[in-house]
Amino acid sequence: MSAAFTVVIPARYASTRLPGKPLQDIAGKPMVQHVWEQAKKSSASRVVVATDDARIVEACKVFGAEVLLTREDHNSGTDRLAEVATQLGLPADAIVVNVQGDEPLVPPSIIDQVAANLATNPQAGIATLAEPIEDVTALFNPNVVKVVADKSGLALTFSRAPLAWARDAFAKSRDVLPAGVPYRRHIGIYAYRAGFLHDFVAWGPCWLEDTECLEQLRALYNGVRIHVADALEAPAAGVDTAEDLERVRRLLGA
């Protein structure tokens, strides 16, 4: 039997690039509802939306989601999850899956996958997923987060910059992907144990996290191992910009 887990969907209203992002309409539903519906198709025992805004609370109540109002001053979605774990009274070994509130096309299969990967890799404090990068434009796009892992599938680092830097190949051209380099895009879905979430908050942000604006770097900086596997099913990219929103609307026939 697979381990039980809870999905938490952080949904923040004040997005820098797309204000009110969780409530943006896609095919007649707010974006956060699409994410919630996908999460409900997974094996999660519970799906909770966590937000800092009363407008999102009210929207979630309309479509029947369990929703918690959290503080507004969290540094990251993971900090928000720690508050949710406390509000829900989750034990330290409970598995919590963070499904980003801007991933309306997240496949339920990878929600189950990342939870199972954490359960079967006790050496890791976090589990997450990736997929191959096959487009050189994506490699140089700072909105596409890159990840490099060791031979055991444990992350070495994450960056918005190309990883690794193919010195000789890029000296000749940056228009094609270098042959033989396994570039991977990080997929922003995470599984944690509830006890880890409280450690994460206690550490506070580090300079590397603040520089890259990547919260998972706080864990690596503090010596926590992150398990990375290739996703069973590659999701479409999430919604960061107005252009992304229009792309998803087209995909869903809005």
UniProtKB/Swiss-Prot annotation:
Family: Belongs to the KdsB family.
Reaction it catalyzes: 3-deoxy-alpha-D-manno-oct-2-ulosonate + CTP = CMP-3-deoxy-beta-D-manno-octulosonate + diphosphate
Keywords noted in UniProt: Cytoplasm, Lipopolysaccharide biosynthesis, Nucleotidyltransferase, Transferase
Keyword Chloroplast in annotation: no
Source organism per UniProt: Ectopseudomonas mendocina (strain ymp) (Pseudomonas mendocina)
Job of this protein: Activates KDO (a required 8-carbon sugar) for incorporation into bacterial lipopolysaccharide in Gram-negative bacteria.
GO molecular function: 3-deoxy-manno-octulosonate cytidylyltransferase activity
Entry GO terms, CC: cytosol
Top-level EC class as recorded in UniProt: transferase
Protein name: 3-deoxy-manno-octulosonate cytidylyltransferase
Transmembrane portions of the chain: none
Pathway this chain belongs to: Nucleotide-sugar biosynthesis; CMP-3-deoxy-D-manno-octulosonate biosynthesis; CMP-3-deoxy-D-manno-octulosonate from 3-deoxy-D-manno-octulosonate and CTP: step 1/1; Bacterial outer membrane biogenesis; lipopolysaccharide biosynthesis
Any one GO BP annotation for this protein: CMP-keto-3-deoxy-D-manno-octulosonic acid biosynthetic process
EC number: 2.7.7.38
Transferase among keywords: yes
InterPro entries: Cytidylyl_trans, KdsB, Nucleotide-diphossugar_trans
